[in-house]
């Protein structure tokens, strides 16, 4: 069995004329990413794949997660083509992960990350900013990942973290 943690980047500011890829996290986005990192600290195992879109806001979100986990930023892998990547692109990349990894993590953008969770679980999902979906996958090799192979185990949102 494998587990996939799919995260949408934290809340970002308006573009104000800058390219969308360069948008940065707001103070709320930073705070939510740090909280999500603390929330998932006991779930994360050092060395598990952490693949991230190269957009500034996703990179910042992943760095805050690493900070909360007590991991070096070296833990994250910037996937050059992941900016606004489709669910199918994510499936291709995840399928290349080492089989020794029982779990893997991605930080990306909607609609791609929400579409990925939907494709894997056959359940409608729309991740809010700094939302996380945990997907349980019943296979031993990441290369076996395809539509319908997952079960949605949980959704975490910034609001749900406040309630607990």
What do the predicted segments below correspond to?
Residues 61-65, 90, 116-117:
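Hydrophobic packing residues within well-ordered alpha-helices of enzyme cores
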Residues 2-82, 124-127, 164:
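Active-site-proximal alpha-helix that buttresses catalytic centers in soluble enzyme cores
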Residues 58-59, 87, 113-114:
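Short, well-ordered alpha-helical microsegments
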Residues 123-153:
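Domain-level recognition of soluble alpha/beta enzyme cores
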Residues 95-105, 148-158:
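A polyampholytic, Gly/Pro-enriched intrinsically disordered region
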Residues 96-105, 110-131:
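Non-DNA-binding regulatory cores of transcription-related proteins
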Residues 82-94:
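Short alpha-helix plus adjacent loop in nuclease-associated cores
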């Amino acid at each position: 069995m494998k587990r996939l943690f799919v995260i949408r980047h934290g809340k970002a500011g308006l573009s104000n004329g800058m390219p969308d890829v360069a948008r940065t996290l707001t103070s709320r986005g930073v705070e939510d990413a740090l909280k999500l990192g603390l929330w998932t600290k006991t779930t994360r195992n050092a060395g598990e794949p952490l693949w991230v879109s190269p957009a500034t806001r996703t990179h910042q979100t992943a760095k805050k997660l690493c900070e909360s986990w007590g991991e070096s930023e070296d833990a994250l892998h910037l996937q050059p083509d992941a900016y606004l990547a489709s669910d199918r692109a994510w499936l291709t990349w995840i399928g290349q992960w080492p089989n020794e990894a029982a779990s893997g993590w991605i930080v990306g953008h909607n609609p791609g990350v929400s579409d990925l969770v939907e494709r894997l679980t056959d359940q409608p999902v729309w991740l809010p900013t700094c939302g996380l979906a945990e997907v349980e996958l019943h296979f031993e090799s990441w290369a076996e990942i395809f539509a319908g192979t997952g079960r949605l185990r949980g959704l975490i949102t910034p609001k749900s973290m406040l309630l607990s």
